[in-house]
């Protein structure tokens, strides 16, 4: 019974995510490319969790993977979390109105971290904390969730990065 309830909740959440994604992609508008050093993120597990990183230009995102390696990926690679079982449809980026905003210093910090390894921990040393560290230049123990990362957002909204 519990499994059935969880399955139904996941199904409803997935349907909501589809509607939300349609709204974000078609009605609200999109951006052609994030700003260099901008925060980017996508949903995981039907929108229950998110994955974040820093856009470094040329269709590349630097992010902390689940095995603790700092990787540089294109958009598809960035969304391909959870061994390909992630149904993410969109990558979001930080915007002020319709214009993407970034942080050149964050892009540099992200690129310098490329190839390094960390002791990944879902709640203590994750992608959001890595992203926050790139943005601020220092470890930020207060950021482990996506909603905490939002306080470092330079813009006032999130927009979908158009394909």
Predicted regions and their residues:
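Cysteine-nucleophile amide-bond enzymes
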Residues: 1-163
